[in-house]
Amino acid sequence: NAASTEAYRAMHKYFGHLTPSQQNEYTGMFKGKNLILISAEAFSPYVISKELTPTLYKLTHEGFVFNNYYQPNWTMSTIGGEFANTTGIIPMWGVQGKTSYAYSKNVSMPISLAWQFRALGYDALAFHNHTYNYYGRDEYLENLGYDYSAIDKGLVLPSKLWPNSDLEMMEATVDSYIQNYVENGVNFHTYYMTVSGHCNYNWGGNAMSRKNREAAEAAYPNSSEAVQAYIACNLELEYALEYLMNALEAAGIADDTVIALSADHYPYAMVTDGEDYYNELTGLNDSEKDTSRYRNSLILWCGSMEEPVVVDTPCSSIDIVPT
């Protein structure tokens, strides 16, 4: 209709007068820094509190603060969000009969973070505290340029649980690449895919929920088991990040290191048996059809930042790699 046509004309005129640029005021801000990128299993901003998760609170309030960040429903469970986080490409079904991540395993991916950092002389490492070849992740991440370790592929954790501990993964991996940087000057880009926040969200089906049950029940005494168990298993991510931050600070390299973190997807398993426990967690009354359901937190933090930078521009997981 006439109104929409006029709107298109206005947009065309506006964009036509813009001068494209590959730079902005923050270009080069983190040049030469190490990068740790984390895809956090079923993470949600409603986990974060100053009292219960002080490390997550610090990372989300003292770096870049993204007020309109989203991790959409890519309809691919974990691997869809992970693909978006690690490539900046929209994950799709039906790419020559395959999903995007499956197709990508056999094509060149030169713009991945790992290959880009390798070209600068960085080590590019990836870790996952679950079975190494789930989703074909071994082929996918190695094709992106990572030296990849996971359960049954070089990563040994003291406990064998479901889900495994994010803290134990950090304890098993962090010291080696920090030491290599401090002693030999080898920069690192490290990628983590966590698992502690995985469903089920109850005391019987989640070892991390059981581990951290007391703290979650004390903080949320009037909440359902589903909400308490979800908070409890995500406390393991908090403890993992606390360990990581302490290690960086002890080595004196927090100022040299950028930490980025995004969910793979919102915790959709909290919608179960006809109950929407995610609404209980959030205090909202939305559904999976609502954009608000996919609003999340993006961490982009470096110890060298003297004050937070607030970003109100809407953005999503496909913006991480280009940024």
Predicted regions and their residues:
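Conserved ABC ATPase "signature" region
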Residues: 4-7
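N-terminal leader/targeting and pre-domain segments
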Residues: 9-11
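Solvent-exposed soluble domains appended to multi-pass membrane proteins
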Residues: 13-323
